[in-house]
Amino acid sequence: MAAIQGIEGVISQLQATAMAARGQDTHSQSTVSFAGQLHAALDRISDRQAAARVQAEKFTLGEPGIALNDVMADMQKASVSMQMGIQVRNKLVAAYQEVMSMQV
């Protein structure tokens, strides 16, 4: 769900840029920087991994109330969010390389 919010932020940024290029008023939409959205997404990925790691440690130590299925689900969520982050990075690098290879 957090990944979708990050993507929605990027989409709203692109829409605001497109509206500005057409000369339309963009004050009705909130302005969110791309770097800010990217940083927030990376923070969420890091937080999710840290929470999964802590829960795994608690399970290993035998704390009551920590079930194996919860630990495994949190570890999978952290893994999926990390893979999503890697894919976003790969797409950004590919887009950057494409822009840099354009002739002026």
Curated annotation (Swiss-Prot):
- What are the annotated GO cellular component locations? bacterial-type flagellum basal body
Alphabetically sorted, this entry's keywords are: Bacterial flagellum
Subcellular location field: Bacterial flagellum basal body
Carries keyword Transferase? no
Q: Which domain of life is it from?
A: Bacteria
One Gene Ontology term from the biological process aspect of the record:
bacterial-type flagellum assembly
Q: List the InterPro entries hit by this protein, alphabetically.
A: FliE (IPR001624)
Identify a single GO molecular function assigned to this protein.
structural molecule activity
Q: Which Pfam families match?
A: FliE
The answer, when asked if Oxidoreductase is one of the entry's keywords, is: no
- Where it mainly occurs, coarsely classed, is other
HAMAP family the record matches: FliE
Family per record? Belongs to the FliE family.
Name-wise, this protein is: Flagellar hook-basal body complex protein FliE
Q: What's the source species for this entry?
A: Salmonella typhimurium (strain LT2 / SGSC1412 / ATCC 700720)
Query: What gene does the UniProt entry assign to this protein?
Result: fliE
